[in-house]
Curated annotation (Swiss-Prot):
One of the primary rRNA binding proteins, it binds directly to 16S rRNA where it nucleates assembly of the head domain of the 30S subunit. Is located at the subunit interface close to the decoding center, probably blocks exit of the E-site tRNA. It comes from the Bacteria. One of its GO terms (molecular function) is tRNA binding. This is Small ribosomal subunit protein uS7. The gene is rpsG. Keywords: Ribonucleoprotein, Ribosomal protein, RNA-binding, rRNA-binding, tRNA-binding. The keyword DNA-binding does not apply. Disulfide bonds: none annotated. It comes from Acidobacterium capsulatum (strain ATCC 51196 / DSM 11244 / BCRC 80197 / JCM 7670 / NBRC 15755 / NCIMB 13165 / 161).
Amino acid sequence: MPRKGHIAKREVAPDPVYGSTLVTKFVNSMMWGGKKSTAQGIFYSAMTNLEQKGGDEAIKLFKKAVENCKPLLEVKTRRVGGANYQVPVEVNPERRTSLAIRWLVSYGRARGEKGMIEKLTNELLDAANGRGAAMKKKEDVHRMAEANKAFAHYRW
């Protein structure tokens, strides 16, 4: 246990275009090597494409995509009497959001299209419609938690 007090969470500034902290978090997680302006350029271009392809407001589709990818349960490994158990635990709201963002960014990058803008646009559109690799990851995590429901009493 750390001896020092609790570290306060940093306040995330809303982004300049949509005024949303969620967008800022997404751009920050997308950023590589401190190149925030590049990440913002990619994100806002993807949002423009998303609006054209999705037929709805881009920010609505983006929020829906993140909301759809948020996991409710996950498994954590717990060692009891020499055996390791995958114990299903509820995910706290902040971690839900960060996991959803992380999955959207990583599976967006892994897509086969050419260019990050196109990849991100299609991954967000798929997630908003309940498809895509990020949604599959969420379902896999839920399936693992469901399969290990018998060990839920090992929760701490």
